[in-house]
Regions:
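Glycine/threonine-rich beta-strand-loop-alpha-helix active-site module
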Residues: 1-78
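Carboxylate- and glycine-rich phosphate/diphosphate-binding segment that chelates Mg2+/Mn2+
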Residues: 52-143
Length: 143
């Protein structure tokens, strides 16, 4: 998904390189971008819902976040069936990634508000209840 988002940034902003988007506030996109459909096959990152993507810069062997308005998906298709055959450790680790996003929201010094706090608390509860279930039984689509 991040590769598709990075490509959408570059294709829709001619004359720039992906490195120009390391600080998305400096180059706000005026282009709508191509219609972008993202379909996650793991849980945790939330990349299908953000303007950021993590790109591996091979010249420095570093993974860095880049962002732009053209990286937002027009449509996100989230189908839990796609996660059923993940190895249990990947299911656990990506579930923990989702948990850290919720905790990060609660502990952030930026833009915490009653809605984000309520959603983060709810997310923590859902993850704590369901992550052990889905690791034990990946076919449990309710978890």
């Amino acid at each position: 998904m991040d590769t598709a988002k990075g490509i959408n940034i570059i294709v829709n902003n001619p004359g720039k390189t992906i490195a120009d988007y390391l600080d998305p506030s400096t180059l706000p996109s005026r282009n709508p971008g191509a219609f972008l459909i993202l379909c996650p096959t793991t849980t945790g990152t939330g990349s299908e819902m953000t303007f950021a993507s993590v790109i591996h810069f091979m010249d420095t062997d570093r993974k860095l976040s880049v962002g732009d308005g053209t990286a937002f998906a027009n449509l996100a298709i989230v189908d839990p069936v796609l996660t059923v055959e993940l190895p249990k450790d990947v299911t656990a680790y990506t579930g923990l990634d989702a948990l850290t996003h919720c905790v990060g929201c609660l502990t952030s010094i930026y833009n915490v508000n009653p809605l984000s706090e309520a959603l983060a608390r709810d997310g923590i509860g859902i993850i704590m209840e369901n992550l052990p279930k889905v690791v034990a039984n990946p076919s449990d689509l309710e978890a």
